[in-house]
């Protein structure tokens, strides 16, 4: 994947909106485009990165050496048993140290919750993480495979994504050798 040159349209302009204390939803249609975009995000920051890899796609690329793993990244591969402890430790980390926190992906996160209403837990966790990252001026990214239906972002399962205020929303689309980033 790294060997193919990809250009990013609007990356620097949109990256300037990804400021400290911000939560950024990254909507995508293609998981490979998402991985390329998140690699670009990771290489553009020098501060520590905590990466929750719920879908294990990025971990697979690192393990196969298709993508070079940055030295400032901690990959977390949660499971149902360790998720709550990992979230607790992450809350402490992002409260004390400026960090890039990446939740990849919202779709995978939902699948970890054994509950009639997983949205309540997932949304509460995102709000709690978002509130705590402000102590250290951290930045959070949440990737999400979704599409806009009837003016609302919707997961492939039909579940609506809760719209929070003060969250940046970006959509990435790839064609040929270019990934376009657009604030939506």
Describe these PLM feature segments.
Residues 1-21:
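Pre-Walker A adenine-sensing motif
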Residues 19-90:
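Conserved P-loop
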Residues 25, 100-104, 141:
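Structural motif
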Residues 46, 68-70, 96, 135, ...:
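Short, well-ordered coil/turn elements that cap or connect secondary structure elements
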Residues 57-58, 107-109, 148:
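Short, catalytically relevant binding-site loops at active-site mouths
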Residues 63, 113-115, 154:
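Short amphipathic alpha-helical segments
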Residues 78-136:
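Phosphate-binding/switch loop-helix module in NTP-utilizing enzymes
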Residues 135-184:
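Phosphate-binding/switch region of NTP-binding enzymes
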